[in-house]
């Protein structure tokens, strides 16, 4: 019955014709009159029109606002990408197709419901840059824009100027509360911060202290990296545990005495386990007869972590040591230092012992969620990437979303 992919693109191309025909209508309007369309669209939605009904007009309005505020006009291919996102798909577009601009039309359209719309980026810089840049379009149309990054949140305010930012696109981001940033019509942020705020909200006692509102619509940039590569990465909020367990230094010493003949190492799977030879050696070093005796369950736990720290975690690659003697994790995707993050289940302590720095108290997990489970909470999820068709099956199986290749 033909290629469903080609059918979708053909259908979306027809819609582009409708949007293009509206261009002359909105070109004639003043910016003030253009902004009034937002209220008109909201009114139509209240009168039971659907987002799909108003989409051609909404997209045409965003294109016009973008031309006037940014001097950037959405190409047809960017409108096709935007429609694919609005329909809850992954839009696969060649880099250089201006993905930042592609997101504006579907974000504007979905923000009209008043339930919020999120743009998810891979790092703090992109979240702030894209928000400050594209917020000019939303602001011209009467919508507010918030940004959430590590330890800070902002709201776009053209009256506010922060001269410290060299990049003009970030100068109008005014510090605000987390709740205000989420309360904006549009919110930009990183996958880590969206996820952690969700966990923090699950630990508050009163509704007033909630940061997020409902998870309505999200566009995830670099979607293959966040939703597939990092899908099972757990986000963890922890507190110091009463039983911190001792003996990390002793186990680090034992691990140092082991050689590659004592364990099976699988770098690709990030796993390591003692073989029979290694078990015997450890038993001798610890002066015990059977490592796997139930009474030694804590020993096995410590030994496993010490072995992992010794063989799988390398200084300057997975972590660095600060001048203060603190072990700081390096993000494997961005190379950035992840201050305040610690490996769980005693692994961080094992690395501290291996490096001979102060071993900090072990922590207890209070709340945890994987990116996969967090993003499945959105009513509608979509994403952008340069290379997703290889993972098309996974996107469909895990998230129920299709990958649409947008023709250049």
Outline where the language-model segments fall:
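Conserved P-loop NTPase motor core
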Residues: 1-408
